Amino acid sequence: MKPNLKEIARQGVRIVSNAGGVNPQACANALRAVIAELGLNLKVACVLGDDMISQRDQIAGHGYKEMFSGEDFPAVDKVASINAYLGAFPVARALQKGADIVVTGRCVDSAVTLGACINAFGWGRDDLDQLAMGSLAGHILECGPQATGGNFTDWELSNNLENIGYPIAAIKPDGSFVCSKPEGTGGLVSVGTIAEQMVYEIGDPQAYILPDVVCDFSKVTLTEIGENLVEVKGATGLAAPDSYKVCSTYADQFRGGTTMSFYGFDADKKAKKLAAAIFTASRRTLKMVGLPDYTETSVELIGAESQYGVNAAVANCRELSMKIAVKHSDPAGIGILLKECVGLGLATPPGLSGFAGARPKPSPVVRLFSFALPKGSLKIQIEMDGTYIDCPDTLGAALKRELIERPQALSAPLDSNMVHVPLIKLALARSGDKGNKANVGIIARQPEFLPYIYAALNEQAVAERFAHFLPEGATQQSLSYVERYLMPGTHAINFLIHDVLGGGGMASIRNDAQGKGFGQLMLDASIPVSAAIAAEVNA
């Protein structure tokens, strides 16, 4: 901020950021010190109340269950953080009180944008459609250049990445907005880039739950109105929920691993042989020193298409990177494996190589425990110039999913002569994580392609495609592991896949612990379409 503060003051730009992390007060105070050093007159406000770590004993005693798995609250001495996801109204209140810069701790990412909208347009808590649109604008903006050509299926169209432009949303009082990027910057803004970001990291698109509103994105429309200009309309809102999502992190075991490369004939077979030897030697040492076996092991051969499972198409692999990793209750168990990885370095099949510095070290497995906290339980405040302003919240209402009117399922096409084409010719895709779940959003390139995609990609087909990442037996219970949602406004389907990330995030020892590449795996699917469509997309 320091290099930009003078220009911020000169132009009267107001800044809202959730950069406060676990200590927003310290961040705000540091900003004030820099502002004073520069002799500027800027007011900094700080949103407080998300941090609940001081209440961990009471929370543990309350008996909260993990909101997805039903697990009990972790041991108190293992808990590192407890933070509630706050909403946008405290941000708006700070702006209304004259703050030039608003710093928050944990809040939903879209709240920084929605808070600015509430302040600018005077939206109230009952303006649900506007709140949903403002939240969608925030959702589009929150991952920066992922809305302007980053992580984009048609990546060849996104150029000058070293100077990629960050997204801009010009929002109107009714909530509709136009996405763009600064002139002269790289990347692009198109219906495709905005659609992909809209489906990123969402679950049920008709019940995208935020503290201030439950959003329905299923009828959103995207219209290209000029070069790098996309108009967004159509999100609607339901009443705010009656609880906050609270995330606690806690230490649970240890993890560690390393990567090494093989090249030459049968590189995949050589890597598998070495991995087996490392595990055998490590387990022998574990037994000698009286330690239990590893609680989880992972070997991934990046280059031999291990991420594709039964759909792998590489034969006679000649070059790959092997990632080997484990979990153990004792860091010494991790150290044993890391030592064996080095010790067996001269005993391997030929072609081993690698680029690395110091030997990796064991690190804690940090797991996430999420639970629903009834509204009214938090003391939310704004601190500005040493004054504390209370921001009481309304209690909200319980979401009744069974009352949501769902789009009509698409009828399967009846073409007699079907031709198989890869999904990537018919659709765009974007995937991401939701804890130990992953979502994969599929956006048809043309509306007429969607019925064919919908017919081919049912819950069973998706479970089978990701079977190597799912718990054993999941393909026999596909409806328990895969949810499928239609989004007619953008001719899209969103899939939510449960228990597919090996714990997700820091709890996982997968190479892709956040499902970032799952969309690419889906785009490889073969979809039967009419001969006319096949001719069109293959032209």
Language model: regions and residue ranges:
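Conserved phosphate/anionic-ligand binding catalytic regions in large, soluble enzymes, centered on
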Residues: 18-23, 99-116, 428-448
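An acidic, phosphate/nucleotide-engaging active-site surface
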Residues: 53-104
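Catalytic or ion-translocation cores adjacent to nucleophile or general acid/base/metal-coordination motifs
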Residues: 36-54, 114-159, 455, 464
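Short, Gly/Pro- and small/polar-rich lid/capping loops
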Residues: 201, 205-228, 397-427
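Hydrophobic or amphipathic alpha-helical targeting/insertion segments
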Residues: 13-16, 21-44
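C-terminal non-catalytic interaction/assembly regions of soluble proteins
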Residues: 233-420, 434, 443-450, 455, ...
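Helix-rich interaction surfaces within compact, conserved domain-sized segments
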Residues: 476-539
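A conserved active-site cap/scaffold subdomain adjacent to cofactor or substrate pockets
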Residues: 131-238, 255
